[in-house]
Each structure stands twice: as C-alpha cells, then as structure tokens.
Design a protein with these regions (language model features):
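Glycine-rich adenosyl-nucleotide cofactor-binding module
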Residues: 76-94, 101
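Conserved active-site tyrosine of GNAT-family acetyltransferases
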Residues: 34, 62, 101, 105-106, ...
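Short, charged/polar, Gly/Pro-enriched secondary-structure boundary elements
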Residues: 2-4, 62-66, 74, 130-134
Length: 171
C-alpha cells in the first residue's frame, strides 16, 4: 500500500516519512536507542490511516519519521484512479550538511550508504534498492524530488498526461 498525501504549501516540503520495521520490533527498545542518540520519540495510536501504532520522532532536518510494525489496507475496493504508482522509489532533499543526515540515517535508522559523490551528494538505502533517500548539499533544507516506480514507459506517459490535464507542476 502506497499512501502519499499532497498538501498545497508555499514551498515543496516532505513533512513526514513512514518506514516499516520488522513485526517483532520492540518499540521500547527502539525508543531507548533513539534516546541514546539524543532523539526524543513517542508512541502514537491511529495517527495515520492503516497504521494502528507508530513510533514517531523528528530527524535533524525537521521531517517527522514514523516507524510502524504492521499495517492494514484502507482502500475501499474501488479501482485506482489516477497514476497508481507501484511504489515510492526515493525521496531527495537539499540539506546544508549531507554528512550529518547520512550519519543520522545510518546510526539511528540503520540505513546503509550506497554511494557518495564527492562530499556533497549521498545515497542511502534501507532495502535492496540502490537508494531510498538521498541528500544533496544546499543552502537550506528543501525537498528536491520524489521518485515513483511505474510499470513501464506507457505508464509514465499516462502519468504525465494526467498531471498535465490537472495542471500539476512536476518540476
């Protein structure tokens, strides 16, 4: 299940990311580990549709991170209307200090570094994909882009047509 909520704002921003952790994960132990890194967290119930319990905290660039162990499908059985992406590929951010974010995502969240380009661009992963997040040096924190996985080129063309019809800016 892929759920993305777009909210019109003055600037592009990714307000929250949610990551699935193994079903047997102990939130109390994760909270202690977060605290050992100076990160405050709290458990929340039903804060996000389909997620009964999450562990919520804020990363160094101000994005809320929610960890969840299990989820339930919240669809109503209707056919997907719109683009219908297969999955979220990755999210990219401009940040003043990519190394700080790479260390946080590595040490605190267990992400692995896939690649560095010099000292200004880092790719990190939490699964078999090359990267799930990347951080590019920039003057201020800013969401750069979101990438979705689509079926094929025809699916991409359909997505672009739909976004164009709705006058949705994609750059």
């Amino acid at each position: 299940q892929l759920a993305v909520e777009f909210v019109k704002a003055a600037e592009p921003k990714c307000a929250k990311l949610s990551f699935e952790v193994p079903a047997n994960s102990d939130f109390a132990a994760i909270r202690r580990e977060l605290q050992s890194h100076g990160v405050s967290s709290e458990e929340k119930n039903d804060s996000t549709p389909g997620l009964s319990k999450v562990l919520s905290f804020v990363d160094p660039k101000g994005t809320v991170i929610e960890l969840f162990r299990d989820w339930s499908y919240v669809g109503n059985g209707q056919q997907v209307v719109g683009v219908g992406a297969l999955k979220l590929g990755h999210v990219a951010f401009l940040v003043p200090e990519p190394k700080v974010l790479a260390e946080f995502y590595g040490k605190v969240l267990g992400f692995r570094i896939s690649d560095w380009i010099a000292d200004f661009f880092v790719f990190l992963r939490c699964n078999a994909d090359h990267h799930t997040v990347n951080f590019i040096r920039g003057d201020k924190v800013h969401m750069h882009h979101i990438a979705y996985e689509l079926r094929d080129f025809a699916h991409l063309q359909t997505a672009c047509d739909l976004l164009g019809q709705r006058k949705t800016p994609i750059a």
